[in-house]
Amino acid sequence: MRSLAFLICSATLFAADYDVLIRHARVIDGAGNPWMRADVAIKDARIVAVGRIPAAATATRVIDARERVLAPGFIDVHTHVEDDIEKNPRAGNFLLDGVTTVITGNCGSSELNLSAWFDKLAKVGLGINVGSLVGHNTVRREVMGAADRQATPAEIARMQALVDRAMRDGAMGFSTGLEYVPGIYSNTDEVIALAKSAAAHGGV
Protein backbone atom coordinates (compact mmCIF):
# COMPACT_ATOMS: atom_id res chain seq x y z
CA MET A 1 0.00 0.00 0.00
CA ARG A 2 2.90 2.35 0.82
CA SER A 3 4.42 1.64 -2.62
CA LEU A 4 1.11 2.44 -4.29
CA ALA A 5 0.80 5.68 -2.33
CA PHE A 6 4.35 6.65 -3.33
CA LEU A 7 3.63 5.98 -7.00
CA ILE A 8 0.50 8.13 -6.92
CA CYS A 9 2.35 10.96 -5.19
CA SER A 10 5.23 10.71 -7.65
CA ALA A 11 2.89 10.94 -10.62
CA THR A 12 1.35 14.07 -9.13
CA LEU A 13 4.70 15.64 -8.28
CA PHE A 14 6.13 15.10 -11.75
CA ALA A 15 3.04 15.89 -13.84
CA ALA A 16 3.79 18.14 -16.81
CA ASP A 17 3.09 21.85 -16.41
CA TYR A 18 1.21 21.97 -19.72
CA ASP A 19 -0.36 19.65 -22.23
CA VAL A 20 1.26 21.40 -25.21
CA LEU A 21 4.09 23.91 -25.22
CA ILE A 22 4.89 25.70 -28.47
CA ARG A 23 8.32 27.32 -28.41
CA HIS A 24 9.90 30.17 -30.42
CA ALA A 25 6.88 30.90 -32.63
CA ARG A 26 6.23 34.04 -34.63
CA VAL A 27 2.95 34.90 -32.93
CA ILE A 28 0.36 37.00 -34.74
CA ASP A 29 -2.48 37.77 -32.34
CA GLY A 30 -5.10 38.87 -34.86
CA ALA A 31 -5.52 42.28 -33.25
CA GLY A 32 -3.41 44.16 -35.80
CA ASN A 33 -0.21 44.15 -33.75
CA PRO A 34 3.21 43.36 -35.26
CA TRP A 35 4.25 39.73 -34.90
CA MET A 36 6.27 38.84 -31.82
CA ARG A 37 8.53 35.97 -30.88
CA ALA A 38 6.84 34.03 -28.10
CA ASP A 39 6.05 30.72 -26.51
CA VAL A 40 2.46 29.52 -26.14
CA ALA A 41 1.27 27.06 -23.50
CA ILE A 42 -1.93 25.02 -23.69
CA LYS A 43 -3.60 23.13 -20.87
CA ASP A 44 -7.01 21.45 -20.86
CA ALA A 45 -7.61 22.64 -24.44
CA ARG A 46 -7.12 26.30 -23.48
CA ILE A 47 -4.29 28.75 -24.08
CA VAL A 48 -3.01 29.56 -20.60
CA ALA A 49 0.19 31.51 -21.30
CA VAL A 50 1.75 33.55 -24.10
CA GLY A 51 5.21 35.09 -23.85
CA ARG A 52 8.58 33.97 -22.53
CA ILE A 53 7.79 30.76 -20.70
CA PRO A 54 10.62 29.54 -18.42
CA ALA A 55 12.96 26.96 -19.93
CA ALA A 56 12.26 24.62 -17.01
CA ALA A 57 8.57 24.38 -17.91
CA THR A 58 7.48 20.92 -18.99
CA ALA A 59 4.75 19.69 -21.31
CA THR A 60 3.37 16.43 -22.58
CA ARG A 61 4.15 17.63 -26.09
CA VAL A 62 6.69 20.30 -27.00
CA ILE A 63 6.69 21.84 -30.49
CA ASP A 64 9.61 23.88 -31.81
CA ALA A 65 7.91 26.45 -34.06
CA ARG A 66 11.05 28.41 -34.87
CA GLU A 67 10.58 30.39 -38.13
CA ARG A 68 6.94 29.37 -38.25
CA VAL A 69 3.87 31.56 -37.77
CA LEU A 70 1.37 30.84 -35.00
CA ALA A 71 -1.96 32.63 -35.32
CA PRO A 72 -5.56 32.27 -34.19
CA GLY A 73 -7.61 30.01 -36.42
CA PHE A 74 -8.98 31.76 -39.48
CA ILE A 75 -12.74 32.27 -39.94
CA ASP A 76 -14.15 31.57 -43.40
CA VAL A 77 -17.34 33.64 -43.47
CA HIS A 78 -18.57 32.49 -46.88
CA THR A 79 -18.99 28.75 -47.26
CA HIS A 80 -21.67 26.30 -48.40
CA VAL A 81 -20.86 23.26 -46.28
CA GLU A 82 -24.37 22.09 -45.43
CA ASP A 83 -23.93 18.75 -47.21
CA ASP A 84 -20.16 18.34 -47.19
CA ILE A 85 -19.63 18.83 -43.46
CA GLU A 86 -21.74 15.75 -42.67
CA LYS A 87 -19.71 13.62 -45.11
CA ASN A 88 -16.38 15.08 -44.01
CA PRO A 89 -16.86 16.20 -40.40
CA ARG A 90 -13.15 16.40 -39.60
CA ALA A 91 -12.87 19.07 -42.33
CA GLY A 92 -9.19 18.50 -42.99
CA ASN A 93 -9.37 20.65 -46.12
CA PHE A 94 -10.17 23.68 -43.96
CA LEU A 95 -7.74 22.82 -41.17
CA LEU A 96 -4.83 22.51 -43.61
CA ASP A 97 -5.52 26.13 -44.61
CA GLY A 98 -5.62 27.28 -40.98
CA VAL A 99 -9.42 27.66 -40.96
CA THR A 100 -11.02 26.59 -37.68
CA THR A 101 -14.45 28.24 -38.03
CA VAL A 102 -16.79 28.39 -41.02
CA ILE A 103 -20.03 30.27 -41.58
CA THR A 104 -22.51 28.62 -43.92
CA GLY A 105 -26.06 29.42 -45.02
CA ASN A 106 -24.84 32.07 -47.43
CA CYS A 107 -26.44 33.38 -50.63
CA GLY A 108 -29.94 32.87 -49.27
CA SER A 109 -29.64 29.09 -48.93
CA SER A 110 -29.47 27.30 -45.59
CA GLU A 111 -30.86 24.40 -43.63
CA LEU A 112 -34.49 25.11 -42.72
CA ASN A 113 -34.50 23.37 -39.34
CA LEU A 114 -31.24 24.58 -37.83
CA SER A 115 -31.94 23.08 -34.42
CA ALA A 116 -32.12 19.57 -35.85
CA TRP A 117 -29.11 20.20 -38.08
CA PHE A 118 -26.95 21.48 -35.22
CA ASP A 119 -27.96 18.45 -33.14
CA LYS A 120 -26.89 16.18 -36.00
CA LEU A 121 -23.53 17.93 -36.33
CA ALA A 122 -22.92 17.65 -32.60
CA LYS A 123 -23.02 13.85 -32.94
CA VAL A 124 -20.58 13.42 -35.83
CA GLY A 125 -17.42 14.82 -34.20
CA LEU A 126 -16.67 18.06 -36.01
CA GLY A 127 -13.06 19.11 -36.50
CA ILE A 128 -14.01 22.79 -36.86
CA ASN A 129 -16.57 25.24 -35.52
CA VAL A 130 -19.66 25.72 -37.71
CA GLY A 131 -22.09 28.63 -37.64
CA SER A 132 -24.98 29.30 -39.98
CA LEU A 133 -27.09 32.11 -41.34
CA VAL A 134 -30.76 31.57 -42.18
CA GLY A 135 -31.37 31.86 -45.91
CA HIS A 136 -34.01 34.04 -47.54
CA ASN A 137 -34.50 31.63 -50.44
CA THR A 138 -34.95 28.76 -48.00
CA VAL A 139 -37.73 30.38 -45.98
CA ARG A 140 -39.44 31.82 -49.08
CA ARG A 141 -39.46 28.42 -50.78
CA GLU A 142 -40.93 26.86 -47.65
CA VAL A 143 -43.80 29.38 -47.63
CA MET A 144 -44.33 30.11 -51.34
CA GLY A 145 -42.52 27.46 -53.34
CA ALA A 146 -41.05 29.00 -56.51
CA ALA A 147 -43.96 31.41 -57.03
CA ASP A 148 -43.05 34.28 -59.37
CA ARG A 149 -44.81 37.06 -57.48
CA GLN A 150 -44.54 39.33 -54.50
CA ALA A 151 -45.40 37.92 -51.10
CA THR A 152 -48.63 38.82 -49.35
CA PRO A 153 -48.51 40.30 -45.83
CA ALA A 154 -49.60 36.91 -44.47
CA GLU A 155 -46.80 35.13 -46.33
CA ILE A 156 -44.23 37.63 -45.10
CA ALA A 157 -45.46 37.01 -41.56
CA ARG A 158 -44.97 33.26 -42.02
CA MET A 159 -41.45 33.84 -43.36
CA GLN A 160 -40.70 36.13 -40.42
CA ALA A 161 -41.77 33.35 -38.07
CA LEU A 162 -39.33 30.97 -39.76
CA VAL A 163 -36.51 33.50 -39.49
CA ASP A 164 -37.40 34.11 -35.84
CA ARG A 165 -37.31 30.37 -35.14
CA ALA A 166 -33.97 29.97 -36.89
CA MET A 167 -32.46 32.82 -34.89
CA ARG A 168 -33.72 31.26 -31.66
CA ASP A 169 -32.19 27.98 -32.78
CA GLY A 170 -28.75 29.55 -33.16
CA ALA A 171 -28.57 31.25 -36.56
CA MET A 172 -26.07 34.11 -36.66
CA GLY A 173 -28.03 36.26 -39.09
CA PHE A 174 -29.92 36.44 -42.37
CA SER A 175 -28.56 35.95 -45.89
CA THR A 176 -29.96 36.74 -49.32
CA GLY A 177 -29.29 35.59 -52.85
CA LEU A 178 -31.50 37.84 -54.90
CA GLU A 179 -30.22 36.54 -58.24
CA TYR A 180 -31.49 33.04 -57.41
CA VAL A 181 -34.99 31.54 -57.51
CA PRO A 182 -37.17 32.22 -55.57
CA GLY A 183 -35.51 35.24 -53.94
CA ILE A 184 -35.31 36.96 -57.31
CA TYR A 185 -39.11 37.37 -57.20
CA SER A 186 -39.12 39.27 -53.90
CA ASN A 187 -39.23 43.02 -53.39
CA THR A 188 -37.25 45.27 -51.08
CA ASP A 189 -39.99 45.46 -48.45
CA GLU A 190 -39.95 41.68 -48.05
CA VAL A 191 -36.20 41.54 -47.60
CA ILE A 192 -36.25 44.39 -45.07
CA ALA A 193 -39.02 42.74 -43.06
CA LEU A 194 -37.10 39.47 -42.80
CA ALA A 195 -33.82 41.21 -42.03
CA LYS A 196 -35.56 43.03 -39.17
CA SER A 197 -36.63 39.68 -37.73
CA ALA A 198 -32.99 38.59 -37.64
CA ALA A 199 -31.84 41.95 -36.30
CA ALA A 200 -34.27 41.64 -33.39
CA HIS A 201 -32.05 38.81 -32.12
CA GLY A 202 -28.79 40.68 -32.73
CA GLY A 203 -28.18 38.90 -36.03
CA VAL A 204 -26.26 40.26 -38.98
Task: Describe the residue ranges of each PLM region.
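Hydrophobic h-region of N-terminal signal peptides that target proteins for export
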Residues: 7-15
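Sec-dependent signal peptide recognition
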Residues: 1-7
